[in-house]
Design a protein with these regions (language model features):
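Multi-pass membrane proteins that catalyze or facilitate reactions on polyprenyl-/lipid-phosphate substrates
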Residues: 1-62, 73-276, 280-401
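Conserved beta-loop-alpha segment that forms the PLP phosphate-binding cup at the N-terminus of a helix
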Residues: 66-69
Length: 401
């Protein structure tokens, strides 16, 4: 393995490195982190194994898409703030473009699709989220206290299905975890290879908090659609713990009840997001393109994409200087453990409503779901292949029926 290289790169070099991964990194956030390790630790030698492990730990602690945040942190280490932006752009651009094109095509030619294809995509979404619930539950809810937090969180958001209920559940689970859970402190490693002053970090954290508080107020005072979209997607990007799939219930609660995107289109787009490389958060580009009223299309996609990723950039840049101290605190890690248990509950609730209730309507749907789960869990089939197979099978079932 090459030794860690401290020589800076240009933002263009960072962009091209992440663009390659954005075109090829299938498999979700855990797989993305493996791709990053192979490319930037083992092959390029940008940083050491221990420094990379620390970056991953930080980004799993923060809300937002962990793999995208690790990418931004790597870009920040190599080329400063322009490098962080270049890494984020390169990694998200391919999947965002594909999903926008899918949204535009669905709006224009969706009626021409064979009957049952969109329903097959819904069934694929059920299978993919069920796989995520199973894997995250085994990892993040290993004991009775965390299983209890998970169950209470799921029941709460099903009983009171609003975005603010989800926020309250996450906050309450964090407090409960801090009070009830016991975790081990992390032993020290070498310092992360990123130099950011505390003053600059506080500026980024302040901007993050100001936007989180002020955007909902602004959207109420000036009910312009672009401001509502900015608020909804910024808030979703600020409050998602546990990875890309957890954004599903937050975004569904924001866009479907308000009529910006109908339920069938939402689930079809979510399934399509499983079939493209890169971060699942680029689902925001699909929703922005498919939403109504304006802005939508390309401008709506760009607005929603920037809004959902902006919190990640602000948090990574703001948290890095403080992470060396915080990662040793048992109480901080216990708080995070409680939050992680809650997000499994949120995802379980989303698996039932809307995914199961709108996707599994007849025995044939359940049979197709079983085969999709078998492919994902037993045969380890890539999700994009399962999505395509379910779309084809849905069309065939509708034709035969």
């Amino acid at each position: 393995m090459p030794t860690a290289s401290r020589h800076p790169d240009t933002a263009l070099a960072v962009f091209l490195a992440f663009l390659k991964l954005g075109c090829s990194a299938f498999g979700g956030p855990i797989a993305h982190l493996g791709y990053f390790r192979d490319e930037f630790v083992r092959r390029r030698g940008w940083l050491s194994e221990s420094s990379y492990a620390d970056l991953v730990a930080l980004c799993q602690f923060l809300p937002g898409p962990a793999s995208s945040q690790v990418g931004m942190a790597l870009g920040l280490a190599r080329a400063g703030y322009p490098g962080a932006r270049a890494a984020g752009l390169g990694f998200t651009l391919p999947s965002a473009l594909l999903l926008v094109l899918f949204a535009l095509g669905l709006g224009r030619w969706g009626a021409l699709l064979p009957e049952g294809v969109l329903h097959g995509l819904k069934i694929a979404a059920v299978a993919v989220v069920a796989q995520a619930v199973w894997g995250m539950g085994r990892s993040l809810c290993p004991d009775r206290p965390r299983l209890t937090l998970m169950a209470l969180s799921c029941a709460s958001v099903l009983a009171w299905p609003t975005a603010w209920t989800q926020v309250a559940v996450i906050a309450g689970a964090g407090l409960a975890g801090r009070a009830l859970l016991k975790t081990e402190a992390v032993e020290g490693h070498e310092r992360l290879p990123i130099a950011i002053g505390y003053r600059g970090a506080l500026l980024f954290l302040t901007l993050f908090a100001v936007l989180l508080v002020c955007l909902p107020l602004a959207a109420r005072l000036w009910p312009e659609q672009w401001l509502r979209l900015l608020d909804a997607f910024y808030r979703a990007g600020s409050l998602v713990f546990g990875g890309g799939h957890v954004v599903l219930p937050l975004l569904q609660a924001e866009v479907v009840p308000k009529g910006w995107v109908d339920g069938d289109t939402f689930l079809a787009g979510y399934a399509a997001a499983q079939a493209v490389p890169g971060p699942l958060f680029t689902f925001a580009a699909f929703l922005g393109a498919a939403s109504g009223p304006a802005p939508n299309g390309w401008s709506g996609a760009l607005l929603c994409l920037l809004a959902i990723f902006l919190p990640s950039f602000l948090l990574v840049a703001g948290a890095l200087p403080f992470w060396e101290r915080l990662r040793h605190e048992r109480r901080v890690r216990a708080t995070l453990a409680g939050v992680n248990a809650a997000v499994v509950g949120l995802l379980l609730a989303a698996l039932y409503q809307p995914l199961w209730t709108e996707g599994i309507l007849r025995p044939a749907d359940f049979a197709l779901l079983l085969f999709a789960l078998l492919a994902l869990l037993a045969w380890k089939t890539p999700p994009w292949q399962v999505v395509l197979a379910c779309a084809v099978a849905g069309g065939l079932i509708a034709t035969a029926g």
